[in-house]
């Protein structure tokens, strides 16, 4: 439900307000591209990050119930592997949400097309590659949220820090240091796609450097800190 409900919530307004995609105020973008971009704005800015925050905290909380952490650490497996395995679970959950997001987009586009008598459905290759890119960009963010959930054992504080870090992302993508803030990565890529669909609105070129090496560094550092924390738990 945590994976499904946010997706449904985001696409219902897109169906209800589908007619607004024709009123683009002189912006050179087609209604079907506008439908796609507007529908994914809420997902990339808030829902994907918020889902990751809640999923990581819930996953760490399973360790606390019924001495789960003691049972887990008693296994003949290194804490590093345990930590990375749990992070992989987060990634797998994210992949499931991505697949459901694609399905929901097409369902919404078909319904909107019937209501407005206009074809809002985009090419499957275009949709799948773009959505996959958005979710791949969320991996460094997932690593940071996983690190927070491991380091901050109080759930309310961990969730609070995670959700608070989401809000500035829409502003940070317009600064020169956006690449250092992983919570802004998916929204940045969506805006790049917006720039391609509507010439002159936003940059249509991805600044791979220094983004790519920095994103890898952030992911590695976050996972290292998470694994170290897991190691201290075993020593206790």
Place the predicted regions along the sequence by residue.
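Membrane-helix interface segments
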Residues: 78-80, 84, 123, 154-159
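Membrane-interfacial segments
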Residues: 20-25, 61-64, 68, 104, ...
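Helix-loop-helix units of permease transmembrane domains in multi-pass membrane transporters
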Residues: 59-91
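Terminal transmembrane helical anchor/hairpin motif
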Residues: 13-36, 159-236
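Functionally important transmembrane alpha-helices
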Residues: 140-171
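Transmembrane alpha-helical segments
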Residues: 60, 140-148, 218-226
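Secretory targeting signals
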Residues: 3-54, 84-151, 197, 201-213
């Amino acid at each position: 439900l945590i994976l499904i409900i946010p997706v449904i919530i985001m696409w219902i307004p897109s169906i209800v307000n589908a007619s607004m995609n024709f009123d683009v105020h002189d912006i050179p973008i087609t209604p079907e591209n506008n439908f796609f971009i507007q529908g994914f704005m809420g997902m990339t800015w808030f829902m994907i990050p918020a889902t990751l925050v809640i999923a990581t905290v819930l996953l760490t909380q399973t360790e606390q119930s019924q001495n789960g952490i003691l049972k887990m650490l008693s296994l003949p497996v290194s804490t590093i592997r345990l930590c990375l395995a749990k992070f992989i679970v987060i990634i797998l959950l994210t992949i499931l949400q991505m697949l459901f997001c694609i399905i929901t987009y097409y369902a919404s586009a078909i319904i909107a097309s019937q209501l407005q008598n206009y074809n809002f459905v985009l090419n499957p290759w275009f949709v799948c590659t773009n959505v996959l890119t958005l979710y791949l960009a969320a991996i460094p963010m997932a690593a940071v949220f996983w690190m927070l959930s491991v380091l901050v054992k109080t759930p309310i504080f961990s969730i609070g820090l995670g959700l608070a870090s989401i809000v500035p992302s829409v502003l940070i993508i317009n600064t020169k240091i956006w690449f250092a803030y992983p919570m802004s990565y998916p929204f940045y890529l969506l805006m790049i796609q917006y720039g391609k669909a509507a010439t002159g609105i936003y940059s249509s070129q991805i600044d791979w450097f220094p983004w790519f090496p920095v994103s890898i560094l952030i992911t590695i550092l976050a996972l290292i800190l998470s694994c170290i924390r897991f190691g201290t738990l075993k020593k206790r």
